[in-house]
Each structure stands twice: as structure tokens, then as C-alpha cells.
Amino acid sequence: CILIALGILYGSAKSSVQRRITLNQLAQKESSTGNWAFDTSMDAINQYKENTIHNLLRYTHREQDKRLRDAAVAKIKTYENWETELTDTLEQGELPNVYWVYAFLDGNNIEHPDNFIQPVEHSIGRISDGVRASLKDPYSLDMGYVNIEAFCRVLDTHFKDSATVFRPGIESLQKALEINAPERKDKKNKQWFDETLSASRMAVKNWLESNK
């Protein structure tokens, strides 16, 4: 299912660049109507009744079909404490779940950005730890479970005025990214890993330079 695959693969540390390109090309060829994957995803959103918004976040990233994204965001905002769920995840959630919060924030509005500042600040240290652990492990492609380019966009989009709060953490993240990482054992995804690491380093460098 191409659209579902795109949702799962957005920024995924275990997908290759070529695979992403192929999926995007296939998705563009599909009809926008009568598509089983799209209809199934839309039904899942419309019928969603879980107590948490967590499993809706996968539909909200910027590479998702806009119709699915809009429907999922609208559903999320019917939950009274949806922003609290996001901030709680940033504070205490597992790193893969933190990834989905930043995927949501990368392109969607929030109502009380001030409530996110401390949770975001705290999450940076955890992201740095995850990146550091991933880079040191030649078998790992995780890169800390977070799309660093998207993360930097989120900081600039929602929290530009709080750059001084985040700067120490981002400097620590930069140091984590500069680790001399051993070559990945997974030769198939080595190029993707190297390109992702380079792009992540550049995103952090650019953020620090533009937020002095």
C-alpha cells in the first residue's frame, strides 16, 4: 500500500533514499480516487476512537497526502488534551514516539507554543543521547530515531523566539553528530546513512549560524 508505506517511511532510519524516491514516483502515478490504500487510511482516521492521539500522528507529517493529513489533524484536535499528550511524549515518551511528535509539529500548527518550550528543551538531550548511541554502533541505522532536518525546521517554525533556550542543547547535539562514526555494516543502506548524517550535521550547523 503505497500511501501507507509513505506514512511509515517518512524519515525512517531504515529506508534507503532510492526506496523513498521509488515510492514517491509510484504514489504520484496512482489515481487520487478509488485508491484502496487511501480509502483504508481515511476510514481508519474517521473511525478512530482510541483514548490517545498517538496512532493518528503517523498521518500528519508533511509528506503525507494532504487530505489524510488534514483529516487526522482535525481528529486530533477533537481531543481535549491533545497538546498535553504531545508535550508529555516529548518529556517522557520513547524516542520513536518523540519522532512522531516532531513529524506532527513539522508542518502543523499548535495553539499554545509556550507550553512546548520546556518539553522541547528536555527532548534535545534525549535526542542527543540517541544519536550518540546510534552513531557509535556500526549496526545501527537509527540516527536517534529523529529526523534532524525536520526537528530544526520545527524549532524555527514554532519556537524562533526561544532559540537562546535551545542553543546549549543544540550545541550538544552538534557534538554528538560530529562523532567519528564507524562504517555501517549494512552495505545496502550505507549511502543513505552517510547522506543522512551529512544532512543532519548541516541542518544543525545552519540552525546554530542563523540563531546566534
Go through the PLM ranges and name each one.
Residues C1-K212:
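Extended repeat-based scaffolds of very large eukaryotic assembly and lipid-transport proteins
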